[in-house]
Design a protein with these regions (language model features):
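Glycine-rich FAD pyrophosphate-binding loop
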Residues: 66-89
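Extreme N-terminal leader/targeting segments of oxidoreductases
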Residues: 4-49, 67-68, 72-73, 99, ...
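Active-site-proximal substrate-binding core of FAD-dependent oxidoreductases
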Residues: 410-445
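Glycine-rich Rossmann-fold phosphate-binding loop(s) that bind the pyrophosphate
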Residues: 53-57, 79
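Helical element adjacent to the flavin cofactor pocket in flavoenzyme catalytic cores
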Residues: 163-166, 189-249
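Glycine-rich active-site loop/strand segments that organize a redox cofactor
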Residues: 89-119
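Flavin (FAD/FMN) cofactor-binding and adjacent substrate-gating region
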Residues: 13-31, 100-106, 129-210
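Active-site substrate-recognition segment that forms the wall
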Residues: 92, 125, 133-141, 228-230, ...
Length: 480
C-alpha cells in the first residue's frame, strides 16, 4: 500500500475502517449510506477547481462555487466518505459566532465583526434550507443554545460579550435566572446562563450526507476513498491520489485537522481531541429529567461540556480535551471507542445522575482543529491558485457555511465581501517546533484540567496552573 505522506494510515486501512462505521461514532453509523456516484478516482482528470476534503467546508465551498458560477467544473476528493472526519463526529451544534464577538471585533473592527456574526446567524437557517433539497432528514431542531456556568468561577463568562453588544445597540443573548437555567436544562449542576435563540441541534453525519447529495445533483464530481497523497505545486497544480491525479486551475485545501500533511499549515494550528457518547433512547427518563429536547447546552470551561437531548429520547454528550497529537498527525488515534470512555461517562452522570440507569449506545472521539485565537482563518498557500482554511476550534457546523462562501470567492478570484472578509488572513499566533509544541501543549492541557477540577471542587487553582492556562487558545467560549 502506498503510504500517505505525513500521515499514519494507508488507503487500505482507510477503506477497512469505513466498513465499521460505529468505530467512528453513532452519528456516522446511523447516517452513512453508499452512493455509486462517488467512486474511487482512477486515472487522470482535469477540473477548474479541485477541492481536497469532503467535510462541511469542502462541500459548502463546492455548492457556493456552483451557485456563483454554475458552469465551473468542480471536482472534490475525500480520503474516506464525506463527513467521516469532524463533520460526522461532532456534537451536532449548529451555532453562530456571536459568542466570539469580542474576538471578531479585535480582529477586524466592530462593523465587520457585526456583519460576520449576523451572517453566521443566517448560516444556521441556510443549513436547513439547503439540506431539505436532499430528501434526507438531518434532525434539524431549532431550539437555541444556553451558555451556562457550572461553578462560581464561570459566572459572568459572557458578560464582556453582552456589554460589547449593548454598546453597539445589539441584543442577541437573554439572561436567565438560576431557576430558569435549571428548569430548561434539567439539572441543578448549571447555576447560571444566557440564552441565544435561532441555534439548532442536528444529526451531523446526516447533514454531511445531505450536502453530498445536493452537491452531486448540482454537478459536482465527487470521488470518495481517494485521499490526496501529494500536492504537486506545478503550473497548474496537480493533486495526486493513490490511483489517479487531478490537474486543476485552482486547488482548495479543506482538510481541517488532516492539514498537517502540508508544510504550509502543519505548524499553524493544534489538533486536540474531543470525546462523545450517545445513550440509548430513554424518553421517559428524559421527560422526568425535564431537559428541553433539541436545546443546545454548554458550559464556560476550556474543556467544555456540551450536550443536547435528541427527539427520540437519546442524550448526546461531549467533552473537549481528549487525545493531544504531536505534529498534528491524526493517524488512527481517533478511531474506535473513546479512550476516555469512563471520564466522559462520569461527566455525564455529574450533570444527570438519573442517566446512570440508561445504557450507552456508543462512545467515540474526534479531532478538533484549534487556531491560536479561536477563530478560523482562510489564506492562499504561497501562491494564488492554492488556497485553504481551517481553525474552527470546535465550532464548525454553522461557520463552515461562511467558510464555503469565503473559499469559493477566493477560488473564483472574486473581489467581494467574502474574499475581503476579516477571516481572510495569515494564520494567527506562533507555535514552537516539535517536540517543544507537544511537550508544551501537553503541560498546558494538564494545567487546564487541574485548574478546572479545582474550581469544580470549590478550591483555588495553583498560581502555576492559572499562568499556564492563559497560554491555551480559546475554545468554544472566550477566555480571560
Amino acid at each position: 500500500a502506498r503510504q500517505q505522506r505525513g500521515r499514519h494510515f494507508t488507503e487500505e486501512d482507510t477503506v477497512k475502517r469505513v466498513g465499521d462505521p460505529i468505530a467512528r461514532g453513532w452519528w456516522l453509523a446511523d447516517a452513512v449510506r453508499d452512493d455509486d456516484r462517488t467512486p474511487v478516482l482512477h486515472g487522470s482528470a482535469d477540473a477548474d477547481v479541485c477541492i481536497v476534503g469532503g467535510g462541511y467546508t469542502g462541500l459548502w465551498t463546492a455548492l457556493r462555487i456552483k451557485e456563483l458560477a454554475p458552469t465551473t467544473d468542480v471536482m472534490l476528493i475525500e480520503r474516506e466518505i464525506c463527513g467521516s472526519g469532524a463533520s460526522g463526529r461532532n456534537g451536532g451544534f449548529a451555532m453562530t459566532l456571536w459568542h466570539h464577538f469580542l474576538l471578531l471585533e479585535r480582529l477586524c473592527g466592530a462593523p465587520e465583526a457585526l456583519r460576520i456574526a449576523r451572517a453566521s446567524t443566517e448560516a444556521v437557517a441556510e443549513i436547513n434550507e439547503v439540506c431539505k433539497n436532499s430528501g434526507i432528514d438531518i434532525g434539524f431542531e431549532e431550539h437555541g443554545w444556553i451558555w451556562t456556568a457550572t461553578n462560581p468561577n464561570q459566572l459572568g463568562a459572557w458578560q464582556a460579550t453582552l456589554d460589547a453588544l449593548e454598546r453597539l445597540d445589539t441584543k442577541v443573548f437573554s439572561e436567565l435566572t438560576r431557576e430558569e437555567v435549571a428548569d430548561r436544562t434539567g439539572t441543578t449542576y448549571n447555576i447560571a446562563g444566557v440564552f441565544e435563540p435561532g441555534l439548532a441541534s442536528l444529526q451531523p453525519a446526516a447533514t454531511a450526507q445531505a450536502l453530498r447529495l445536493v452537491a452531486l445533483d448540482r454537478g459536482v464530481r465527487i470521488h470518495e476513498h481517494s485521499p490526496m497523497v501529494e500536492l504537486q505545486r506545478s503550473d497548474p497544480p496537480v493533486v495526486r491520489t493513490a490511483h489517479g491525479s487531478i490537474t486543476a486551475k485552482r486547488v482548495v485545501i479543506a482538510m481541517q485537522c488532516w492539514s498537517g500533511s502540508l508544510p504550509d499549515l502543519r505548524n499553524k494550528y493544534l489538533t486536540l481531541g474531543g470525546d462523545l457518547l450517545m445513550t440509548e433512547p430513554a424518553p421517559q427518563v428524559m421527560q422526568e429529567i425535564g431537559i428541553e429536547p433539541g436545546l443546545l447546552v454548554s458550559d464556560s470551561r476550556l474543556l467544555v461540556h456540551y450536550y443536547h437531548a435528541r427527539p427520540d429520547g437519546r442524550m448526546a454528550f461531549g467533552k473537549a480535551g481528549g487525545t493531544f497529537r504531536p505534529g498534528n498527525l491524526v493517524g488512527t488515534k481517533y478511531e474506535g471507542r473513546s479512550r476516555n470512555e469512563e471520564w466522559i461517562k462520569s461527566s455525564l452522570y455529574a450533570f444527570y445522575p438519573a442517566l446512570r440507569t440508561v445504557p450507552v449506545a456508543a462512545t467515540w472521539s474526534g479531532a478538533v482543529d484549534r487556531s491560536m485565537d479561536g477563530l478560523p482563518f482562510f489564506t492562499r498557500l504561497g501562491r494564488p491558485d492554492i488556497i485553504g482554511g481551517l481553525g474552527y476550534s470546535g465550532n464548525g457546523v454553522g461557520p463552515s457555511v461562511l467558510g464555503g462562501k469565503i473559499l469559493a470567492s477566493m477560488a473564483l478570484d472574486r473581489l467581494d465581501d467574502w474574499s475581503r472578509c476579516g477571516l481572510v488572513r495569515q494564520p494567527p499566533g506562533f507555535l514552537p517546533p516539535e517536540p517543544l509544541r507537544y511537550v508544551g501543549g501537553s503541560l498546558v492541557k494538564m494545567a487546564v484540567s487541574r485548574k478546572e477540577r479545582a474550581e469544580d471542587a470549590g478550591k483555588d487553582p495553583s498560581r502555576l496552573d492559572r499562568m499556564l492556562t492563559r497560554m491555551a487558545p480559546p475554545g468554544l467560549v472566550p477566555t480571560d
